[in-house]
Amino acid sequence: MSNVFDGDSPTNLAEYSVSELSGSIKRTVETAFDQVRVRGEISGYRGPHSSGHAYFALKDDRARIDAVIWKGTFSRLKFRPEEGMEVIATGKVTTFPGSSKYQIVIETLEPAGAGALMALIEERKRKLGAEGLFDAARKKRLPFMPGVIGVVTSPTGAVIRDILHRISDRFPVHVLVWPVKVQGEGSGEEVANAIRGFNALEPSGTIPRPDVLIVARGGGSLEDLWSFNDEIVVRAAAESAIPLISAVGHETDWTLIDYAADVRAPTPTGAAEMAVPVKAELEAQAAGLAARLQGCMNRQMDQRRQSVRALMRALPSLDQLLALPRRRFDEAATGLGRGLELNTINKRRGFERVAAHLRPDLLAGRIAERRQTLNERMARAERMVERLIDRSKSRVDRAEAILASLPARLKTQTDRGRERLGNLSRHADTAVRHQLTRARSELSAQDRVLQSLSYKNVLKRGYAVIRDEDNRPVSQAAHLSAGMGIAIEFADGRVGAMTTEGGTPPAGAKKRSTKPAEPPKQGSLF
């Protein structure tokens, strides 16, 4: 300090160094403004610094003052500062001697009245609404009966207990709780991350993806609920692919997440009631529907029973149903017997007509051929009878299928008819087989007669057949002349011989022609 008694000094003012003056100002300001309340608009806010401190300014229409909130104080704020928000800051004013600047160190911060916050909410609401985040077309329907419910709320307090208790009472399901802070610094980010985290789960993963989400918080002041007005929370709710129920505060409390959610519940308990139905009511409804269904089925059964009775009255009796098939079967069986008998008679007559003109060896071959043909026809006749019987049985089976739904009385008549038809089938089969056996017996007898008429059987009894040089049988001595070569056929072979004299022909007998005779024409057995 200079000498105050120096005669050259124009005044008696004390002289300060820059440091002394800055320190004196600092002490004066901090003493005079140790605790002040300042109203102003937040300006230049960019969120907390990496150190955790927040730096911004408070301004009005004529002045501006720098402000700082230390990390410890910032974490205790009830709401998050935002650019343009009008607030009331409480703290002390201090200066920095090194730069000749002053600032307010904020100890508490509160909105400058509810009107300021509401104005900010309205401005944000208009902005997000213009982007379509609140459109009704984005809303999703809640599932009727979710299997898993995700809850985003504080893990402590009455809210989560009320939700779990209400869900357990109404319809117990699996509940996943994502614990978050519901107010204070960082609460908005935690709520948004929880919503996105639930949406990122795989439906078939180890932790199942919820079918519906509940974002809940208890009641509080506008500042307490401010996190749910945060833009990041609103966007996360609007982007959620899982239907979301907002249950923030009481019924009169509205936040921006309520507009972005698919459904707003007045309270957390109301959200639980919206998420699941009442199991007892569902059981009662199911019982009522079952009773109505049973009544409907009973009415349908009565109607069907009456229809069956009407059909039974209109349906002809079993005898009427089987009359035509039975008559056709009888006609076929009778016609078959008569046809076989007539055919056998005709064949016998034809055989008798041509038997005299047939040579035994050729006749035996023809008989074998005809026997084979007859056997084939008999086999075809048997197959035809079997097919006729099968068709009759098929008709009876179809009649049985129609009659199967009729009362027991009609079924008894069907059984009796089936038994009669079986007897008729067996009688017809027996009759046909008897006719075939008799025809075979007659044919065998005729074959034996034919064999007995063969000249070879006569030769076996000591007779012989004499044939001329042309191998023709000689039945009279007059047909031979002296010196003619002949063949004598015995039962075991032939021998040649020569006549020594000719026979004397009887009176009126024509001389035998020496012209070779034509072989006799073979007659046909059929």
From Swiss-Prot:
Keywords: Cytoplasm, Exonuclease, Hydrolase, Nuclease. It is found in: Cytoplasm. It catalyses: Exonucleolytic cleavage in either 5'- to 3'- or 3'- to 5'-direction to yield nucleoside 5'-phosphates. The keyword Iron does not apply. Residues 497-526 are annotated as: Disordered. InterPro entries: Exonuc_VII_L, Exonuc_VII_lsu_C, OB-fold_nuc-bd_dom. GO terms for molecular function: exodeoxyribonuclease VII activity; nucleic acid binding. One of its GO terms (cellular component) is exodeoxyribonuclease VII complex. Signal peptide: none annotated. Its EC number is 3.1.11.6. It holds the Pfam family Exonuc_VII_L. Its main location: cytoplasm. The keyword Cytoplasm applies. GO terms for biological process: DNA catabolic process. HAMAP family: Exonuc_7_L. Belongs to the XseA family. Bidirectionally degrades single-stranded DNA into large acid-insoluble oligonucleotides, which are then degraded further into small acid-soluble oligonucleotides. Heterooligomer composed of large and small subunits. This is Exodeoxyribonuclease 7 large subunit. It comes from Rhizobium johnstonii (strain DSM 114642 / LMG 32736 / 3841).
